[in-house]
Amino acid sequence: MSLPIGQVGFIHDESKRVLRLNATNKCITRLPPATDVKDGLVWEDSVDRAHLDLRFEVLREGLPRGSEHYPGIDEDARTRFLCAYEGGRLVGCSTLQTDERGGCRFRIRGMAVSPNFRNRGIGSRIVKRLQQYASEQGTGIWCNARIRAVPMYKRCGFVEVSDVFEIEGIGLHYDMEWK
């Protein structure tokens, strides 16, 4: 039960659980039965190095290494992580933080899609799955959306609820909500 060394991917074990293996065939995530792997989207129970590397590459340009980690949030048992895979490679990630505000229980953070995989609907698929989860919980979602991501969030039904503002070292954002 392994993959070729150097390839990240998924296999099923004898109990029908999905295992995500890293490049050395070490099991890094045990997921519920395969029904949780859908359209290349996988709920993760924690962030791993690939997740942090993608966050850093896409979201933390010019900032020091380590800024891609969200202390206290990444370790919070209530935090959910949704990742997108294509060909066994992590190409998109998001963090769904429990951070209640005005009718929204959840906040999207760390939403990133690999530059080589943009404009393929991966970000929208991630957001729609997060919305499905929030809807099942009877709540909405809020986020601080980068200017370049606002059109995607609007297509997914989010609305701007603030004027544009700057997060130092990161760039211009809008506060957005989906209820």
Language-model regions: role of each:
Residues 134-146:
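Conserved GNAT acetyl-CoA-binding A-motif
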Residues 13-14, 23:
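Short hydrophobic alpha-helical segments enriched in small aliphatic residues
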Residues 21-87:
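Short amphipathic alpha-helix that is part of the acyltransferase structural core
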Residues 83, 89-99, 105-112:
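Conserved beta-strand in the GNAT
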Residues 142, 159-175:
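Conserved catalytic-core motifs of GNAT/GCN5-like acyltransferases
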Residues 76-78, 102, 167-172:
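Short acidic/glycine-enriched loop/turn segments that link adjacent beta-strands
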Residues 5, 55, 153, 158:
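Conserved active-site tyrosine of GNAT-family acetyltransferases
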